[in-house]
Regions:
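Extended, low-hydrophobicity segments enriched in charged/polar residues
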Residues: 1-121
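Alpha-helical oligomerization segments
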Residues: 144-188
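Amphipathic protein-protein interaction modules
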Residues: 98-159
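Generic detector of bulky aromatic hydrophobic side chains
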Residues: 55-63, 78-84, 106, 130-142, ...
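N-terminal low-complexity, intrinsically disordered segments
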Residues: 34-44, 49-50, 70-71, 128-142, ...
Length: 188
């Protein structure tokens, strides 16, 4: 358990046990399974915005839809340790995912996802959302890989359909095996 400055709560830091299901289900490549295990009903990519106002609307839309899906449970929030981005609890132990990337993983919720990381100019993206989020029941997973200009999401078909149809989100449905790179984007 760790404490955040100005916060009187203690927060549980995740271990490799909380992300084994992600690590064992993802593989390198350009398909959605480079970020999301092939265990969900539906998948989508959501392009990251380019300006601050669009970021705020994007983040609010994502959190509202994910919150509708998983309001009554805790969420795991993952912050990628790039050396430049805010990872919230910099001295806490990290987990390793994907191709050796280190994440701080903390059990919290939608409110903390919206407020712990400050949005604004930064070396990578400007949004406040964590790079990795999933609820305790693993019913959905959101992952923004450090070198992509989009977010990958897997979950129930109804949730993914709502994300893909939301007017504030530039999202598209993606099938397993399909290149997840959004149109007009280049995979790293």
């Amino acid at each position: 358990m760790v404490r955040r400055s100005g916060d009187d709560r203690a927060w549980r830091i995740g271990t490799d046990a909380e992300v084994t299901w992600i690590a064992s289900g993802t593989s390198e490549g350009r398909t959605i399974t480079s970020a999301i295990p092939p265990m969900f009903e539906a998948y989508a990519t959501v392009v990251l915005p380019h300006d601050a106002e669009a970021w705020d609307r994007h983040d609010r839309a994502i959190l509202a839809l994910l919150g509708e899906q998983s309001a009554d449970q805790s969420w795991w929030l993952g912050y990628l340790d790039t050396g430049a981005n805010d990872i919230v609890f910099p001295d806490a132990p990290k987990v390793t995912l994907y191709t050796g990337w280190h994440y701080l993983l903390v059990e919290a919720g939608a409110e903390q996802a919206a407020t712990w990381r400050q949005s604004g100019p930064g070396p990578f993206w400007n949004g406040a959302l964590p790079d990795l989020m999933f609820p305790a029941d693993h019913s959905w997973l959101l992952s923004t890989l450090w070198d992509d200009a989009w977010t990958c999401i897997g979950g129930p078909a109804e949730l993914v359909s709502k994300l893909a149809g939301h007017p504030e989100l530039e999202a598209r449905l993606v099938a397993l095996g399909e290149d997840a790179t959004p149109p007009d984007h280049q995979a790293p």
